[in-house]
Amino acid sequence: MLQPKRTKFRKQMTGHNRGLAHRGSKVSFGEYALKATSRGRLTARQIESARRALTRHVKRGGKIWIRVFPDKPVTKKPLEVRMGKGKGGVEYWVAQIQPGKVLYEIEGVSEELAREAFALAAAKLPLATSFVKRTVM
């Protein structure tokens, strides 16, 4: 599972997930990409699950890049614990996603295979996504 090796602070405030993705919105590494068209949070488990779906579908052909990293901790208090007594412990890590963010990239496979693989990966994600091609090689 993806998570930071070390952070400056153990816990973060919830914050807001506003705006559009300007950084990380272009296809930089591969030929085809899966781009988010809605906003939300991707957990480390969801990112890994979609990655597995991609790699299993393309088998040995092609190279895959993961363009998102879960760097935000989400805390949760234990069950049946009264309010107060501080913030809960870190439960899992998320990546905050804005519309326009490239999530995965792939190269070395046909467009048809890439579309099929991204469709399988998109089914694992809680976001609306679209298939994009690299414009300038």
From Swiss-Prot:
**Gene Ontology CC terms:** cytosolic large ribosomal subunit
**What PROSITE patterns is this protein classified in?**
RIBOSOMAL_L16_1 (PS00586), RIBOSOMAL_L16_2 (PS00701)
Q: GO BP, one example?
A: translation
Signal sequence annotation: none
Q: Which GO terms describe its molecular function?
A: rRNA binding; structural constituent of ribosome; tRNA binding
InterPro entries tied to this protein = Ribosomal_uL16, Ribosomal_uL16_bact-type, Ribosomal_uL16_CS, Ribosomal_uL16_dom, Ribosomal_uL16_sf
Name the SUPFAM superfamilies for this protein: Ribosomal protein L16p/L10e
TM spans (from-to): none
Q: Which domain of life is it from?
A: Bacteria
Q: Relate the assembly described in the record.
A: Part of the 50S ribosomal subunit.
Q: Which family does it belong to?
A: Belongs to the universal ribosomal protein uL16 family.
Q: What does this protein do?
A: Binds 23S rRNA and is also seen to make contacts with the A and possibly P site tRNAs.
What protein am I looking at? Large ribosomal subunit protein uL16
Q: Which gene encodes it?
A: rplP
